[in-house]
């Protein structure tokens, strides 16, 4: 970290969701280097220095670095969880759940295969329903007690393609999904470099396409896509895909494809993926508000 600009270092440490956000933190006087106030976004950060941010929202830091990723994606792709019943698939320490709560979610079902990982301030929130020891692949509306309005997911060491049938099956007809695609878990072992970092743009594009293609098989269409505000801790680039049910391609249980359904993404979806992954810019469907034919 020696010699890094303060705004760059704050972003790299997961204390800010973008360079602009980092600069704002510094300008507001909330950045600290080894406990001392730092006032210049361009100022150097000594090697080994401890970075902190004070006076964070609600008086407490987010439950994880990943929280900043979802926070940025909700802004970037213009999604609002206020008043919604949400599912956090792969909740871990609760970073995504934390963001949803702070943004006004009515209730969050936090599902993870592990146990006792949620940060205390997340676990103790009355709006959180903890489902430890639960596989995302096994989820059903009956298990959750209701269909959900919004699904968010941050999963590791598993392809989103393996859980999409379950996730598509638990959303309400008006529901939406915001899933973080991690190419290193989508390209397959044979295509993954020894470093574990997917650097080939074509491979990253194909990773996202694979997720969106599986989503289409479940009756979901790509509404928007954008890059994560932060890279993975290993340096992998990650992407958020916003999916919603298509009225002409309805979700169906257990991955069963409805006879006669169009089960592949349209040309616009592939164009959105190529532009967002290749150009690192958000893309939204042009016909977002146009009525669909049944």
Which positions does each model-derived feature cover?
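Conserved class I S-adenosyl-L-methionine
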Residues: 81-92
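Glycine-rich SAM-binding Motif I of class I
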Residues: 94-95, 116
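A basic, amphipathic helix-loop patch mediating RNA/tRNA/ribosome contacts
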Residues: 1-49, 85
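S-adenosyl-L-methionine
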Residues: 106-165
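Conserved S-adenosyl-L-methionine
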Residues: 99-107
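Short, glycine-/aromatic-enriched active-site segment of Class I SAM-dependent methyltransferases
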Residues: 183-199
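Core SAM-dependent methyltransferase catalytic element
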Residues: 232-276
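A short glycine-rich, Lys/Arg-flanked "PGG" loop and its adjoining helix->strand segment in the class I
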Residues: 161-178
């Amino acid at each position: 970290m020696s010699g890094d600009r303060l705004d760059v270092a704050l972003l790299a440490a997961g204390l800010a969701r973008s360079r602009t956000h980092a600069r704002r933190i510094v300008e507001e006087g909330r950045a600290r280097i080894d406990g001392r106030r730092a006032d210049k976004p361009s100022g150097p950060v000594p090697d080994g220095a401890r970075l902190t941010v004070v006076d964070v929202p609600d008086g407490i830091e987010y439950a994880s670095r990943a929280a900043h990723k979802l926070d940025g994606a909700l802004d970037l792709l213009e999604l609002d969880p206020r008043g919604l019943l949400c599912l956090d698939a792969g909740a871990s320490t609760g970073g995504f759940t934390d963001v949803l709560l702070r943004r006004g979610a009515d209730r969050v079902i936090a599902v993870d295969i592990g146990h006792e990982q949620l940060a205390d301030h997340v676990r103790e929130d009355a709006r959180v329903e903890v489902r430890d020891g639960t596989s995302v692949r096994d989820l059903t509306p009956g298990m959750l007690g209701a269909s959900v309005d919004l699904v968010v997911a941050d999963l590791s060491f598993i392809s989103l393609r393996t859980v999409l049938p379950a996730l598509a099956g638990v959303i309400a007809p008006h529901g939406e999904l915001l899933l973080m695609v991690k190419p290193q878990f989508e390209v397959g072992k044979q295509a993954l470099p020894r470093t574990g970092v997917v650097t080939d743009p074509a491979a990253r594009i194909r990773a996202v396409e694979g997720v969106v293609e599986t989503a289409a098989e479940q009756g979901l269409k790509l509404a928007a896509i954008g890059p994560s505000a932060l890279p993975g801790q290993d340096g992998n680039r990650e992407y958020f895909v916003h999916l919603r049910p298509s009225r002409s391609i309805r979700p169906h249980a257990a991955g069963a494809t409805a006879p006669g359904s169009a089960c592949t993404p349209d040309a616009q979806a592939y164009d959105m993926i190529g532009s967002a992954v290749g150009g690192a810019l958000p893309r939204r469907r042009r016909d977002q508000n146009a009525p669909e034919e049944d």
